[in-house]
Amino acid sequence: MEEDERRDIVMSRASSCMQWSQWQLLDSILPTGGFAHSFGLEAAIQTRLVSSPEDLETHIIHVLDNTASLLLPFVYSALKSPDIETWHKLDGILNATLTNQVSSKASMSQGSALFRIAASVFTEVPNLKMIRDASLGSKNVCFHHAPIFGLVCGLLGMDSETSQRAYLFVTLRDVLSAATRLNIVGPMGASVMQHRIAIVTETVLEKWMNREAGEACQTSPLLDVVQGCHGYLFSRLFCS
């Protein structure tokens, strides 16, 4: 009886500690460089595709749906098998799948930063540092963000649904942060919009979650085209 109680206490504490890791992984203070990217929003504003809060909300929903259809399969596949061989394979597939240089560079930049931070912060998971160190010298690894996010979540012991929901949360958070700095919506309006879009995001998650990398696809090719124009903007605040 005492052993069962002790086991329950240990499991409860482990679960609580995991929640702290989950929250830290989603905290905007984690220096992964997400603040430097607008997910194509800046280009959409300058090309007049987004010019009001209403346009912004529609744009964000399309971004979330495209992110879920294209990138959630890589998150899911990586967290299901969080090992170096699977990650390298998924990284290569995603590198061949991304169709514009701007989004590809943004993905590599954020992925590299996330892996560096995760290996330094979550020292209780030595495999993070081991996998990163073993891959740093390889010319065939691009360090794309989605597979690394899935790998980190898998090694931290996060469940599949929470990990995929977390990826969409990070996307929603960063796009709204960019919108605030681009003065399309204020901080209060962004918070209200985030809460409202969360309901739609859950529907998007249910539609696209638990798919293999081979099922990845784009649902909004126009977003991809617009983001690819980012490098041609005369003046810009964000890297993508």
UniProtKB/Swiss-Prot annotation:
Keyword vocabulary terms for this entry: Chaperone, Nickel insertion
Cellular component GO terms, alphabetical: urease activator complex
GO BP term, example: protein maturation
A Gene Ontology molecular function term of the record: nickel cation binding
Phenotype upon gene inactivation: No visible phenotype under normal growth conditions, but mutant plants cannot grow on medium with urea as the sole source of nitrogen.
Domain of life, per lineage: Eukaryota
Self-association and partners: URED, UREF and UREG may form a complex that acts as a GTP-hydrolysis-dependent molecular chaperone, activating the urease apoprotein.
Role: Required for the maturation and activation of urease via the functional incorporation of the urease nickel metallocenter.
Homology family: Belongs to the UreF family.
Protein name in UniProt: Urease accessory protein F
